[in-house]
C-alpha cells in the first residue's frame, strides 16, 4: 500500500486487509493526545480500521467494538508509547447533550486522555469536547460490494473553549 499523508487523503479499500493496512499507515503517524473520529454507516469498517491503528501503535488486547462498554483501553507494549482508548459512542447518539468527557471519566479509565490516542467510533460532533482538533476519517460502502472508500482530514474545532 502506498504512503499516505496524515494531513488529508482518500483511498479505495477493496478488501478488509486494505482497510486494516490503511489504519496501520495512519496509525504509525499518530501521537499521544491525538483524537481520531471514525464515521460511516453500520458495517462500513470503522472497527476494522481501528484494528489497523492498534497494529501500528503496538497495543495489547483484541480490538472489538466497545459499543456496550463505551470504551476500552489498549495499553502499549513498549515503554514511552501511548495507549489507545477505543471509544464507541453509538449508544449516546440519541443523547447529543451527553457529557462525553464526564462519561469517559465515570469509566475510571486507567489512562489519561492526553497521554493516549483516542479512536472514537460515531464521534462526529462529540470529539470537539476532547480536543481542539481531530482526525476525521470517513468510510463509505460501495453498494453490493466489499469495497470501501476512505477519506480523511484534520478538523479544527472553533467552538472549543
Swiss-Prot record:
ATP binds at residues 43-48. Mg(2+) binds at residues 47, 121. GO terms for cellular component: cytoplasm. It comes from the Bacteria. InterPro entries: P-loop_NTPase, T6A_TsaE. One of its GO terms (molecular function) is ATP binding. Keywords: ATP-binding, Cytoplasm, Magnesium, Metal-binding, Nucleotide-binding, tRNA processing. One of its GO terms (biological process) is tRNA threonylcarbamoyladenosine modification. It is found in: Cytoplasm. Belongs to the TsaE family. Required for the formation of a threonylcarbamoyl group on adenosine at position 37 (t(6)A37) in tRNAs that read codons beginning with adenine. Is involved in the transfer of the threonylcarbamoyl moiety of threonylcarbamoyl-AMP (TC-AMP) to the N6 group of A37, together with TsaD and TsaB. TsaE seems to play an indirect role in the t(6)A biosynthesis pathway, possibly in regulating the core enzymatic function of TsaD. This is tRNA threonylcarbamoyladenosine biosynthesis protein TsaE. The lineage of its organism: Bacteria, Bacillati, Actinomycetota, Actinomycetes, Mycobacteriales.
